[in-house]
From Swiss-Prot:
Classification via PANTHER family: SMALL INTEGRAL MEMBRANE PROTEIN 12
Localization per record: Membrane
Bilayer-crossing regions: 15-34
Cellular component GO terms held in the UniProt record: membrane
Name assigned to this protein: Small integral membrane protein 12
Origin superkingdom: Eukaryota
Taxonomic path: Eukaryota, Metazoa, Chordata, Craniata, Vertebrata
Entry membrane topology: Single-pass membrane protein
Predominant cellular place of this UniProt entry's protein: membrane
Keywords tagged on the record: Membrane, Transmembrane, Transmembrane helix
InterPro entries noted in UniProt: UPF0767
Organism: Mus musculus
């Protein structure tokens, strides 16, 4: 009798296990929501690093006067002379 029972269980196992798993999953799902209670209010999303950086850059730009810029000639004086003036003729 036992070998026949095991053969039947082995043959029809997929048809038996899916409904059992479905019922166990549904009961567990509803039990979890019952224990957890009300859903919490969604937390306001925090700004990403890129958004915070853009906000900081915009705040920095608001305080500057963009009409006052350094001329390109003055910027060249700050470059290391050993590298950039190696192949240039000396200034007179």
């Amino acid at each position: 009798m036992w070998p026949v029972l095991w053969t039947v269980v082995r043959t029809y196992a997929p048809y038996v296990t899916f409904p059992v798993a479905f019922v166990v999953g549904a009961v567990g799902y509803h039990l979890e929501w019952f224990i957890r209670g009300k859903t919490p209010q969604p937390v306001e999303e925090e700004k990403s690093i890129l958004e915070r950086r853009e906000d900081r850059k915009l705040d920095e730009m608001l305080g500057k006067d963009h009409t006052q810029v350094v001329s390109l000639k003055d910027k060249l004086e700050f470059a290391p002379k050993a590298v950039l003036n190696r192949n240039r003729p000396e200034k007179n």
